[in-house]
Amino acid sequence: MKKEETPADKLLKKAESKIGCSYEYGATGPDKFDCSGFVQWCHDQIGVTVPRTSGEQYDQGASATGAKGDLVFFKKNNKINHVGICDGDGNMINAQCSGVKKVAISSVKPNWGMGDNCGYKTFL
């Protein structure tokens, strides 16, 4: 019997389909994204409404643990400045604003100057 696809599975599929798309500040898809626009677009594709900015997403999301489909947030200078979608294996799919400047898979551990990991939230 085939296992039914969970909302987290569906979200990850949408996120994976955009790997390689360009980063652009303020962009919300479907071919260019900033980090929070990417998160919002992916959720929208599975029928889940998510706020536009990473700060709003952090404030309005429910507490989570970093499981598949959860959002991971980063803070720099006391301000939420980055968000990605957890794959459940210690990585995230995110629209990177520096480095490759594309939607890519990277570690949930802080790197490329994104700030400190400050927690996980979910809208699923």
Give residue ranges: language-model regions.
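A general structural signal for well-ordered alpha-helical packing
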Residues: 8, 12, 36-39
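Catalytic cysteine-centered active-site loop
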Residues: 17-68, 115-118
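Soluble non-cytosolic domains of exported or imported proteins
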Residues: 2-9, 29-33
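Thr-Gly-centered strand-to-loop micro-motif
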Residues: 25-26, 74, 95
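Short, intrinsically disordered low-complexity segments
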Residues: 1-2, 51
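Aromatic- and glycine-rich peptidoglycan recognition patches
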Residues: 6, 13, 52-64, 80-124
